Amino acid sequence: MFSDKDLAEIKNHELTVDQINDQIAQIKSGMAFSKLKEAATVGNGILKLKEHEETYFINLFDQRSPELSMVKFVPASGAATRMFKFLFEFLNNYDLTQGSINSYIEKSNNKELTKFLEAIEKLPFFEEVVHKTHKVIPNFNDLSFEEERVEFVKTMLDEARLNYSFYPKGLLPFHKYKARVSTAFEEHFFEAAYYASSLNVANLHFTISEIHNKNFNEELNYIQEDIEAETNKTFNTSFSYQKKSTDTIALTLNDELYKDTDGSILFRPSGHGALLENLNDLDYDIIFIKNIDNVVVKEHHQNISNYKKMLAGILLDVQDKTFKFLNQLIFFNLYFISKTTF
């Protein structure tokens, strides 16, 4: 079934033939859907703490944190391509000669485009895009409304302009403050300073795409000194790539291996579940996990920190009780053995 070339490619991806056959069988049979029993509610899957309990768990974490090793684990390999899918559709399908953008939206039902245009001036990258567009098109202000919006989107996505869709979401302008704009990547450092640090040292680990390694390191070198000065923390930052051994194959409609035009097997990165491999490589007492674009502006960092500390405090409390029970079991087992032996 597999050619010598196929076998070499499979081996190069750190996979085995058995694993590929398992993938093929799974694709053919399909994935079983989970049957949901009911929605989680407070008291039934959702824990609601009283105010004094919140304080207890936060204090427990604060007291124990100096003796713990901690890291913030951030999946950050996602590219912005999917985020801008509706804008690519707009550029590909909208014809300036056929009517207004509003008429296009009505025909295409592109609701995301409506929201985008209504809030366009509030976007964190608005000024950057306008500035770049003026450089590319000197008479930008003389264009019609429709032409302006088309050129604005082109500047965002065109490879010869800002090429936002190439970059990972973590490195795009993300939050807009009065005097500056920050990326999601940068915000994670400020947030980590509140709860994922011990003895004024914070560890962060980002999983990234290999093609963006240079971009992330450049951004890190640009922001680290200022962030450390502002937070009075030292940051240890590491990166890893999603492992090739977690890639998956695809099948044609005839259930044959899908191959590129050069005859090589098409391997595609798996979802976030594949990052369990990267997570398992880390050795820390506590690992805080947060996706790259799940980060808030600075004014909410303290509130977010309290919830993270509560969760970690609950973890420590459960761990303490578990260890206590295990030690009691060990003691009683030893006691029982000594009684039956002598």
Describe each model-derived feature in a short phrase.
Residues 2, 7-14, 32, 36-342:
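Domain-scale recognition of functional cores that engage charged ligands
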Residues 7-27:
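Conserved catalytic alpha/beta core of Sir2/sirtuin-type deacylases, generalized to analogous enzyme cores
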